Amino acid sequence: MPIEQCYRLRMFPSDIVKNAMILWAGPKNHLVQYPLRGGKLFNLVAVFHSDKYVEGWNSTADPVELEARFAGTCETVQALLSKIGTWRMWVLCDREPVRHWSRGRSTLLGDAAHPMLQYLAQGACMAIEDGVALADKMADSNGSLADAFKEYDDARYKRTGKCQLLARLYGEFYHAEGVRRELRNDMLRGRSTEQSYDGLAWLYDGI
């Protein structure tokens, strides 16, 4: 059963195509670059469907598989990949949204409660929001952890579940093939950057 692999490395601005956040989408793969540390470094991330599974979060990647998965992509992507030596890799995982992640005097937050794919870049953001919501509920609970945790679950499960499911959808959108790919390109061609951001205002406006 194919899984999704993520390869990542950091590059200097002199090694990239353009000093900007750019995503190249292709059939069952995509490549994205985005700035780190105020633009002093760039993260380059390649995601593709793979038949391999490697346990862990920071394994040495297989450049042969990467080259094979991105064969036939545009010259810009090929030029970027040709500059690269050692990649790090991990397998992407999520699960179905759940309604509760608290029990008694114990609760979860972040990926432990609602693991999600990276396509919305919201895993860490949701964990931070969880922490804020949990602190608020505990402050209002009059010392009852069970009540605080129940209210915390109630306050968070829909928003985090929406992120989990939408991240999957974005993955399918990025990696589309055939007619789906053509329809995706037509839709994006007719949208401005502002329209794309507006569609996710519910997410990026925070809680």
Where are the regions a protein language model picked out?
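C-terminal auxiliary extensions adjacent to catalytic cores
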Residues: 189-207
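C-terminal domain-closing interface element
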Residues: 174-193
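Amphipathic alpha-helical interaction/coupling elements
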Residues: 69, 148-151, 182, 186
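Short secondary-structure junctions and interdomain/linker hinges
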Residues: 73-77, 159, 194
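Conserved FAD-binding catalytic core of PHBH/FMO-like flavoproteins
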Residues: 1-85, 98
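Conserved mid-domain beta->alpha element of the FAD-binding
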Residues: 33, 65, 86-169, 173-175
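Short, hydrophobic secondary-structure boundary micro-motifs
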Residues: 78-81, 163-164, 199-200
